[in-house]
């Protein structure tokens, strides 16, 4: 279950990918080498979210990547794909029981090893720490340090995701300190074209070679 949990973890952003960019930009990230793709949409438009998630699931299957749904157990269960839960998004243990042993489920742990311990105990496939740098998506999130990665790497067998303001410039330091994956939104998708997204994804993926 965790063999492929290494490399670029692309996360979508609805406002950033408005105007028909979602699918072409997501596919560009996958072509460039993203191993995980998280569909993150906080709107209440259930019909659109289902349509978009289904389309993304097909893209991930085509490119050998894993789709993760943010904070929607029902949608993840309906599509048979992965799930990411924040601290207020419901029980990870319940999600594991619902989705089964083989589905990838991740948990947000902010900057706290104790939260990671709980996530692991409840069946998390990976543990996500951050924000490590200033983040456009969650500017008020608690800050994490690279020392936290050192501690997490020695304490947990699960893959570690670093998130929050990650760029091509600062990602190598996170990887060197134990990040199995770097989760990227703006540094990947705030681009003028799908080709630019593909080039950025390829550059991020190369950091793990």
Swiss-Prot record:
Q: What is its EC number?
A: 2.5.1.3
Some GO term, biological process aspect, for this entry: which one?
thiamine diphosphate biosynthetic process
The UniProt note on the cofactor reads as follows: Binds 1 Mg(2+) ion per subunit.
Q: Which CDD domains match?
A: TMP_TenI
**What Pfam families does this protein map onto?**
TMP-TENI
Q: Which GO terms describe its cellular component?
A: cytoplasm
GO molecular function per UniProt: magnesium ion binding; thiamine-phosphate diphosphorylase activity
Q: Where is the signal peptide?
A: none
Tell me which residues bind 4-amino-2-methyl-5-(diphosphooxymethyl)pyrimidine: 38-42, 70, 108, 138
Q: What pathway is this protein a component of?
A: Cofactor biosynthesis; thiamine diphosphate biosynthesis; thiamine phosphate from 4-amino-2-methyl-5-diphosphomethylpyrimidine and 4-methyl-5-(2-phosphoethyl)-thiazole: step 1/1
The record's keywords, sorted A to Z, are: Magnesium, Metal-binding, Thiamine biosynthesis, Transferase
**Which family does the entry's similarity section mention?**
Belongs to the thiamine-phosphate synthase family.
Protein name as catalogued: Thiamine-phosphate synthase
* UniProt gene name: thiE
């Amino acid at each position: 279950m965790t063999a492929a949990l290494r490399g670029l973890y692309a996360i979508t952003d609805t406002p950033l990918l408005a105007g028909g960019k979602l699918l072409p930009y997501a596919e560009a990230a996958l072509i460039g080498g993203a191993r995980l793709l998280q569909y993150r949409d906080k709107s209440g438009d259930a019909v659109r979210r289902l349509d978009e998630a289904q389309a993304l699931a097909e893209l991930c299957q085509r490119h050998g990547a894993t789709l993760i749904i943010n904070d929607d157990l029902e949608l993840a269960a309906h599509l048979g794909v992965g799930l990411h839960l924040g601290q207020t998004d419901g029980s990870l243990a319940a999600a594991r029981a619902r989705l089964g042993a083989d589905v990838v489920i991740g948990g947000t742990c902010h900057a706290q090893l104790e939260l990671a311990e709980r996530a692991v105990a409840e069946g998390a496939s990976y543990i996500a720490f951050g924000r490590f740098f200033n983040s456009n998506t969650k500017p008020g999130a608690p800050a994490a340090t690279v020392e936290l990665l050192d501690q997490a790497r020695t304490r947990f067998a699960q893959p570690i995701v670093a998130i929050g303001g990650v760029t091509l410039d600062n990602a190598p330091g996170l990887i060197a300190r134990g990040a199995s994956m770097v989760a990227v939104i703006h540094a990947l998708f705030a681009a003028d074209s799908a080709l630019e997204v593909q080039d950025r994804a390829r550059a991020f993926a190369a950091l793990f070679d």
